[in-house]
């Protein structure tokens, strides 16, 4: 069992959060899992729909553009040839097969679990009390949001905030306060966070409810 301290809006310790040992259990080659997961995320963002027409697919007359002899020009067969404007493309991109990269749920959960555990072990994950997200700021105040980061000794660089989806109606004050800070990378919700968000973020501030929900989701089916 691992204990993490949680902080209130003023940087004071407000209790502890327990994490099961199964959360830190590593399955297989962890770095390879993370690499495969990130490659899948980045590859699947592409549409894979680039398609060009060759000379047999473009719409052109098959009539010769000019007579075979007597003009002084090189002989030409039709305007669909690639050297003409509007002609077919040679060796252009074609969606020949489904190029999306697939990764199963077990691998995805193991990769996210490894990334989160690394953030915890390097002291780059701060657990905030739920009141920080829901009750601390009723109106947007960037200065107060920055003061919270400094009071928790969070390095103001690449900070990702993660909250529980059930708080979406109540965290608008904090969310709007953070969007004007260059140090804040983004605002995500527990079950929607992916490995690319975690890799890109240098520091993470997560609410207690989001962390417990995420840990329960990621450790379901693992051996204690």
UniProtKB/Swiss-Prot annotation:
One of its GO terms (biological process) is translation. GO terms for molecular function: rRNA binding; structural constituent of ribosome. The keyword Lipid biosynthesis does not apply. One of its GO terms (cellular component) is ribosome. Gene3D superfamilies: 3.40.1370.10. InterPro entries: Ribosomal_uL4, Ribosomal_uL4-like, Ribosomal_uL4_dom_sf. The keyword RNA-binding applies. One of the primary rRNA binding proteins, this protein initially binds near the 5'-end of the 23S rRNA. It is important during the early stages of 50S assembly. It makes multiple contacts with different domains of the 23S rRNA in the assembled 50S subunit and ribosome. Part of the 50S ribosomal subunit. This is Large ribosomal subunit protein uL4.
């Amino acid at each position: 069992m691992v204990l993490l301290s949680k902080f209130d809006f003023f940087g004071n310790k407000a209790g502890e959060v327990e994490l099961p040992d199964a959360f830190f259990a590593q399955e297989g080659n962890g770095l390879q899992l993370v690499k495969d997961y990130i490659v899948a995320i980045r590859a699947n963002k592409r549409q894979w729909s680039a398609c060009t027409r060759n000379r047999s697919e473009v719409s052109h007359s098959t009539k010769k553009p000019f007579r075979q002899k007597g003009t002084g020009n090189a002989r030409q067969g039709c305007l669909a040839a690639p050297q003409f404007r509007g002609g077919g493309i040679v060796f252009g991109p074609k969606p020949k097969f489904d190029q999306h990269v697939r990764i199963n749920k077990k691998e995805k959960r193991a990769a996210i679990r490894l990334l989160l555990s690394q953030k915890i072990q390097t002291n780059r994950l701060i657990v905030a009390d739920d009141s920080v997200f829901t009750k601390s700021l009723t109106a947007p105040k960037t200065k107060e949001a920055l003061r919270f980061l400094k009071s928790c000794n969070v390095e103001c660089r690449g900070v990702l905030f993660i909250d529980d989806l059930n708080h979406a109606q109540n965290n608008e004050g904090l969310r709007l306060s953070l969007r004007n800070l260059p140090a804040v990378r983004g605002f995500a919700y527990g079950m929607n966070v992916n490995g690319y968000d975690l890799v890109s973020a240098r520091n993470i501030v997560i609410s207690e409810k989001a962390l417990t929900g995420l840990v329960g989701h990621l450790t379901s089916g693992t051996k204690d």
